[in-house]
Amino acid sequence: MVDQRIKFRHLQTFVEVARQKSVIRAAEILHVSQPAVTKTIRELEDVLGVSLLEREGRGIRISRYGEVFLRHAGATMTALRQAVDSVSQEAARAGPPVRVGALPTVSVRIMPKAMSGFLAEKTGSPVKIVTGENAVLLEQLRVGDLDLVVGRLAAPQKMAGFSFEHLYSEKVRFVVRAGHPLLSPGLSVFDHLHEYPVLMPTRQSVIGPVVEQFLIANGVPALPIRIETVSDAFGRAFLRTSDAIWIISEGVVAADVADGILAILPVETGDTSGPVGLTVRADTQPSLPLSLLMQAIREAAGELFDGRTEG
C-alpha cells in the first residue's frame, strides 16, 4: 500500500531535481523557493528511509536508491499525465499527444516520410518532435516528457528501464565539401587529418565515444583543430565555406551527398557501425497513435533500406 504521506508534489519535485541535476534550477521551473524544494526532498527521503540525492563536488547526483525510485516515479508521472490527457482529449475529441525525441540522423532521413504516413491515419493527435543529444532525450523519456526516442542504441548502462527495437545499422562517415583537396586520388586521409579543422560529435553524444575509439585505433590520438558540435545546420554551413572535415552519422548527410553538395572521404568506417531504432519505456504501453507512428517509422526505414543492414 502506498504511504499516504507521499504526495504528488513530492514526486513532481524529485523528478524535476533529477532532470535538472540542480535544486536551484528545479525551484525556478517549479516556481517555488529553493528551501521549499530542499524541504520537499527531505520529507520524501524521511518517508522512504533512504537518501535519494548525494553531493558531488559543487553539485548533486542521484543516489542508487534515487535511480530506482526515479524509474517508478517517472512511470507514475507518465500515467498521471496520460490520465489528464485522456480527459482533455475526450472533451476535445482529439487523440492523445505523441512526443518524440529524434536524433539528427533520423530527423533528416526517416522522420519526414514516417510523419507523412502517420498524418494519413488522421488520429487527431498533436505531435511534438524534438532533437538533441541522446543522453538528454533518454532522460526526458525516462521522466515521461517524451514517449519515444528514435536513434542509435545507447550504451548498456543508459538503457536500464528502456526497451529497444532495432530497425537498421548505420556507419559514421568522414564528410567534406565537394572539391575538397583530400578527395584527390591516392591521399591518406589519416596522414592529413591534422591539417584541417575537424567537426566532431560531443563526448556526451551517442556516437562520441565510437568516433574517439575509431580515431585512436587508427593512430589519431589528438586533433589540433577540433570543433565539437551536435548541430547539423552548423556542420552543413561550415563545410560549404571551408575545408573542414565533418565526422558524422551517415544518415545526417545522405541527402547532401546524393545532391553532390557534400562528399564522403575514402575512409573504411565499418567498425563504427551501430544499431538505429526505437527506444521506449519498458514499463508503459504505447497509446494507439504512438503505435501507429512507430509502425510508420518501421515502414519508412524498411522502404529506405529495402532489407539492407547498413545505412
Swiss-Prot record:
Pfam families: HTH_1 (PF00126), LysR_substrate (PF03466). The keyword GTP-binding does not apply. InterPro entries: HTH-type_LysR_regulators, LysR_subst-bd, TF_PcaQ, Tscrpt_reg_HTH_LysR, WH-like_DNA-bd_sf, WH_DNA-bd_sf. It comes from the Bacteria. Transmembrane segments: none annotated. GO terms for biological process: 3,4-dihydroxybenzoate catabolic process; positive regulation of DNA-templated transcription. Residues 6-63 form the HTH lysR-type domain. One of its GO terms (cellular component) is cytosol. The keyword Transcription regulation applies. Activates transcription of the pcaDCHGB operon for the catabolism of the phenolic compound protocatechuate. NCBIfam families: TF_pcaQ. PANTHER family: HTH-TYPE TRANSCRIPTIONAL REGULATOR YBHD, NITROGEN ASSIMILATION TRANSCRIPTIONAL ACTIVATOR-RELATED. This is HTH-type transcriptional regulator PcaQ. It comes from Agrobacterium fabrum (strain C58 / ATCC 33970). The gene is pcaQ.
